[in-house]
Regions:
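Glycine-enriched, solvent-exposed interface loops adjoining structured elements
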Residues: 1-200
């Protein structure tokens, strides 16, 4: 279902005139519906390990503790690394982590050499100890914050730019979430809609 289709369906169910465009609209009510749908999608995307938002990243290691910004390594809207998915495909070994601050400081207090690497993310950077060998192929899965895909099938985003944008999350949940958010915004009783939504 596209952005335009879900907004039109919502409008029909809510007794609102059906728009012919959403992203090109100047109607404040249509723009509010779009904003509420974006709010719903961004919230729903944080509620678990959605397979539709799972992406694999590959990285060639550098011979330094910091492997660089995680957003540069995992380029499609990085939210977090799925636990126990980083593997050194060159050595065929798992990379342990993420470890916490205390564990990291403990590692830094002793001299270690590979091949059992451990990682953490600090300040938006992927840090590894001991320093890895350059040129190893590492791969991992991460959850993306991008729950929208463009009609081209390759542009991922978390805000709408075109009426033809589609959802990676279930249409029914997005529509249910939009309905209770709209009722709340209008000062109407949304408790029953919210309870039904939360039960899904």
């Amino acid at each position: 279902m596209t952005l335009l289709e879900i907004v039109q369906q919502f409008c029909l169910r809510s007794g609102i005139p059906k728009p012919v465009t959403v992203t090109g609209s100047t109607d404040t009510q249509v723009l509010q519906i779009q904003a509420l749908l974006e709010e719903e999608g961004n919230d729903l995307a944080t509620r678990g390990d959605w397979e539709a938002l799972t992406i694999e990243a590959n990285h060639t290691t550098l011979a330094t503790e910091s492997q660089g910004a995680i957003g540069t390594i995992a380029t499609n809207g990085f939210r977090y690394i799925k636990n126990q998915t980083i593997w050194d495909r060159t050595d065929r070994l798992p990379v342990i982590g993420p470890i916490n601050s205390r564990q990291w400081q403990g590692l830094k207090s002793v001299v270690l050499t590979g091949p059992r690497y451990q990682f953490r993310i600090r300040g938006g950077n992927l840090l590894v100890n001991p320093v890895p060998v350059a040129g190893h192929d590492w791969a991992f899965e991460y959850i993306s914050k991008n729950w929208i895909i463009g009609a081209d099938g390759i542009t991922y985003k978390n805000l709408f730019t075109l009426d033809t944008d589609e959802f990676l999350l279930p249409d029914t949940l997005l529509l249910m979430g939009l309905r209770w958010r709209w009722m709340r915004e209008k000062g109407l009783d949304y408790s029953e809609l919210f309870s039904t939504y939360e039960a899904q």
